[in-house]
Curated annotation (Swiss-Prot):
Top-level taxon: Eukaryota
Record-given protein name: Lipoyl synthase, organellar chromatophore
Coiled-coil positions: none
Main location: plastid
Phylogenetic placement of the source organism: Eukaryota, Sar, Rhizaria, Cercozoa, Imbricatea
Compartment(s) where it occurs, according to its Swiss-Prot or TrEMBL record: Plastid, Organellar chromatophore
Keyword Iron-sulfur (UniProt): yes
Reactions it catalyzes: [[Fe-S] cluster scaffold protein carrying a second [4Fe-4S](2+) cluster] + N(6)-octanoyl-L-lysyl-[protein] + 2 oxidized [2Fe-2S]-[ferredoxin] + 2 S-adenosyl-L-methionine + 4 H(+) = [[Fe-S] cluster scaffold protein] + N(6)-[(R)-dihydrolipoyl]-L-lysyl-[protein] + 4 Fe(3+) + 2 hydrogen sulfide + 2 5'-deoxyadenosine + 2 L-methionine + 2 reduced [2Fe-2S]-[ferredoxin]
Length: 291
């Protein structure tokens, strides 16, 4: 299936990308931008932003849509990683940072303690940087979620990924209701925290199902939703079922913001979980909450 013209991306600024890549290489850090073959890597790196991928690069799950390497071996966590992330945030002068992880089902708490350490390291190295964490489902372990909550990042993101009807095919080790419950638990325990979720389209869902997922998310007071076109990483991954038009992405945004009252819906063909995440600071400013 040929990509339509609206999925073309601008050539990246090689000089800026090279600078960021050298820094990440020097500090031995991974980014989801590279590991997941994100189409926005040029734009984000050129703008001096990155989403750090911790506890990787191998993932203990093998979701058929994802380009991150599968690795079910038992691996220790690198306890120097949080300090290196803090240093990178400081050297890159990031105003907003996103920290995400692979699934680490081999760890007792799914890696929640490592998230906490990374949040603390960023706070120490760059106190004014706002922190967003994109967390796995921790196999539904609420104690793990509570650890991350206690560290008080500004925003917690957990992606719902797709619609219930095709969940088992797209995310075989995930559970739709479990992800909803996780997001509900987060908001129920800290109503001042901003919550976020995202999904892909083009996997076999229909537009009505996308809107139903958005309604489910808004019912549990999720604040921000991201919606983007699924792009198959290769022949061993799930195929693309359809290309959603820019007009329909605009419709998702309009319905989400004007009718469902999300604070923000980021909905474009190239949107990914952390796309334009730096704009979150403006969202906080315009919609302040108590600390």
């Amino acid at each position: 299936m040929l990509k339509p013209t609206w999925l073309r991306v601008k050539a990246p600024q090689k000089e800026r990308i090279g600078t960021i890549n050298r820094l990440l290489t020097d500090l031995k850090l991974n980014t989801v931008c590279e590991e997941a073959s994100c189409p926005n890597i040029g734009e984000c790196f050129a703008g001096g932003t990155a989403t750090f991928l911790i506890m990787g690069p191998g993932c203990t799950r093998a979701c058929p849509y994802c380009d991150i390497d599968f690795d079910k071996s038992i691996r220790t966590v690198d306890h120097t990683e949080p300090t290196r992330i803090g240093e990178a945030v400081s050297r890159m002068r990031l105003k907003h940072v996103v920290i995400t992880s692979v699934n680490r089902d081999d760890l007792a708490d799914g890696g929640a303690s490592h998230f906490v350490a990374c949040i603390a390291a960023v706070r120490a190295a760059s106190p004014t940087t706002t922190i967003e964490v994109l967390i796995p489902d921790f196999c539904g372990n609420l104690n793990s979620i509570d650890k991350v909550l206690a560290a008080k990042p500004e925003i917690i993101n957990h992606n719902i990924e797709t619609v219930p009807r095709i969940y088992n095919r797209v995310r075989p080790q995930g559970v739709y209701q479990r992800s909803l419950y996780l997001l509900d638990w987060i908001k129920s325990n800290d109503k001042n925290l901003y919550t976020k979720s995202g999904l892909m389209v083009g996997l076999g869902e229909i537009d009505a199902e996308v809107l139903e997922v958005m309604a489910d998310l808004r019912a549990i007071q999720v604040d921000v939703v991201t919606i983007g076109q699924y792009l198959s990483p290769g022949s061993k991954h799930l195929p693309i079922d359809r290309f959603v038009t820019p007009t329909q992405f605009d419709n998702y945004k309009a319905i989400g913001e004007l009718e469902m009252n999300f604070l923000q819906v980021v909905s474009t063909p190239l949107t990914r979980s952390s796309y334009h995440s730096g704009e979150f600071r403006n969202l906080m400013r315009d919609n302040p909450r108590q600390n």
